[in-house]
Amino acid sequence: AVHDAEGKEIPLTHGNYIALLENQNRDILKEAFENLYSVYKQFSNTLSAAFGANVKQAVFYAKARNYTSSRQSSLSGNEVPESVYDNLVASVRKSLPLLHRYASLRKKLLGVEELHMYDLYVPMVAEADRHYTFEEAKDIVKTGLAPMGEEYLGLLQEGFDNRWIDIYENEGKRSGAYSWGVYGCHPYVLLNFHGTLNDVFTLAHEMGHSIHTWYSNKNQSYTYSGYKIFVAEVASTCNEALLIRHLLKNSKDKQEKAYLLNYFLESFRGTLFRQTMFAEFEQK
């Protein structure tokens, strides 16, 4: 749990962790971050052993199938040359000055002497921060995805109307957001909706996955209906790009537009720089 300015206890869960990190009260940010990761630290040896075992397993299977490395084994399933992986890491590293510039701007606008991990999610433009109901989120997503056409919007509405989505956090429910399904049945979406702007984008993102799955199942046999993770994120991030474009185009308020640009910049940090850092960590 964490405590607000009045000392009231707020439950800390995997589902509401990111929402708490968007709070303007820095004490709440710090407490939420430290309380969550202190639990993981208690199991550091177990987590290290599990990670080590996973690496050994990947190496074993790669050698058994005559690959030169587990990386080559992983990429070959998508027919992606290792040079693409290397070029991604190298190109992103060349762009690190842009990330550092963004971090400096965030530090300046937040007015902090040191920038910590728990400072990365809080909006830099507090005045435009707002809460969305799920009904508002659905309307925003439908309007933003209008360029996808009537058929696509019809499927989107079908998902909204026919219980494709488990919306809110609940006891025992896993964190994050996912889309999943089986052949012959419509997909299902898991959300942990708390009414943030990020939650609105998450709805658009996960419905992108679900409608991709719906179309794939409709047009392919069971054997060929699945798709690789390498292409899976195209459908979802396309929806996010359309949504941010719509919101920026129609925003009439400078503060709101700055808030949206803040979100867009943070999505670049998380999607491009952060994921490539993971890739480089695994490579080394």
Which residues does each predicted region cover?
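Cation-handling catalytic/transport regions enriched in His/Asp/Glu
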Residues: 1-284
